[in-house]
Amino acid sequence: HLPDDEREAVIRFNMPRLLDRGFFDEAALRSAIATARAQGWVNLNTGLIPGMAGVAVPVFDALGRPVAALSVGTLAERLHDERLPNVAAILTAEARALGAALNPFDPTLRYPSRALSAVEGGLAKIR
């Protein structure tokens, strides 16, 4: 759900790491992104961590921009095909409630890199 240019930058940045782990090639990643956008959630049970699986949903602000994500990680056997849609639906409902409660004037949402810089600068002064 990111703007095209931002999505492409994220893919370019992360692709070497994904390839290094044998996790995804670029075509598979792009296919997974398209599927996630269409269904509204993403699920991975690929063996990155043997026996683990997860599902994640985006959290949108009042303008429909993705600002966060909610996810659940569990044992792969607990996130089976019958249970997965229910877990995704619960996460989606919670993400909508969270998104509706976000303050649109919070500078952290509008300029996350500035907010993180301020936090890091403050921490540097404390150390």
How would you name each of these model-derived features?
Residues 20-23, 57, 84:
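Short capping/connector residues at structural and topological boundaries
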Residues 39, 50-51, 68-127:
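Juxtadomain coupling helices with adjacent low-complexity linkers
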Residues 1-48:
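Short, solvent-exposed recognition segments
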Residues 59-62:
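Sensor-regulatory modules in signal-transduction proteins
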